[in-house]
Structures are given as C-alpha cells and as structure tokens.
Amino acid sequence: MWRSARVALLAIGVLTLFGCASAEQEWVRPGAGRVVRVAVLPFENQTTSLRAGQAAGDLLVSQLLATGAISVMDPSEVADLLRRENLDPADPGRLPSAQRVGRLLQVSHVLYGAVTEYRYKPGFSETPAVGMTARLVDVASGEVVWTASHARIGSPWFREDGLARVAQQMAHDMAAHLTFALGDARAR
C-alpha cells in the first residue's frame, strides 16, 4: 500500500514538473541607453492562427504600459502614421527598416518580432504552445539593443492553461526583462 502511494505521489510530482515547460533566451547590448519612447509594431504571424501576431503585439503593449517604466506610443497612432506613408501595418514583413519606421514615428526605439507558434498540441490532453521572438532597435544607431526568444507550453493538468494565458504570461516576462534592463529605474 505504501509503495503504491509513493508511486502515485511521484507520478503527480513528475506531471507537475513537466506540465508547464518553457525556454527563454534574452540579451541586452552592453551600454545600451534607456528607452525614452517605444513604438511596438504588429508582430509577424508565422503561424496558421489568424491574428496571432496582432495579439502578441497588443499583449506586449499592455504589459509594457503596466510597468510604467517605458513610454509606449499608442498602437492606433502607429498604424495611422504608417498608413499615411502608404505602409501596411498589417504586413510587418513588408515594412521598411525599424530605424526608418522609428524616424517616421519620432520614437527612440522600435519593438518588433514574430509569433512562431500559437496552437494546441494534440495528445492525451491538448496542450497550449506559444513561441515568440522580439527585437528592440535603437532608432539613432539602427542597432538591435535587446532581443528575446520565448517558447512556452502550458499545462493541461490541474490548471487548465489556454493559449491566451500562456501568451499573456510570456508577454509579461518579456516586458519585465526589457523594462528592468532598459526602462526608467525611477518608475520601478
């Protein structure tokens, strides 16, 4: 009896540990200056899920604003200014360089990226999986000063994670790292 209880407890522990897996890689350019004002472009959608790129960009804007450490340009203003220049904000792959877009928008930095995975993985229980990459470009120099690549699998066990929750947590983690590294320290 004790043996079967220990086996059951061990199985629950293993499922809990492996129920939510993530991989994160982040980098900050040494000596990079503080972000004064950032424009977040719609993220490129490399998935089959409609609007995954737009959702990722919106989540990052919300999370950056929530920190209070970085001034974020209103996404509707970004879209309007791009349209006035005959650029389609809904097609991030065809936009000019981030430096050129940043000069047009009069911001210090431009944040852009891609959603590489946004789906439920089939199996015994469908598991949400989200992958995103992001880059922050200093408009003055044209250099990438921050990058992040996150992949996360939610838990189908005990705590039912959905795609939106996994993506929101990922955006929160990216925004926290970015604001810690390059945001206004007085706002933290």
Predicted regions located by residue number:
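N-terminal segment of the mature soluble domain
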Residues: R34-R37, T47-V107, Y112-A114, T147, ...
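Short, surface-exposed coil-to-beta transition loops
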Residues: P128-M132
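Bacterial N-terminal signal peptides that target proteins for export
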Residues: M1-L9
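Solvent-exposed coil/turn segments that connect beta secondary-structure elements
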Residues: F43-Q46, I70, P75-V78, V115-Y118, ...
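C-terminal/domain-edge helix-coil "capping" segments
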Residues: C20-V36, G57, V101-L105, F124-T127, ...
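Second-shell loop/turn segments in exported
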Residues: F43-L50, E85-P89, P122, P156-D161
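Bacterial N-terminal signal peptides
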Residues: A8-F18
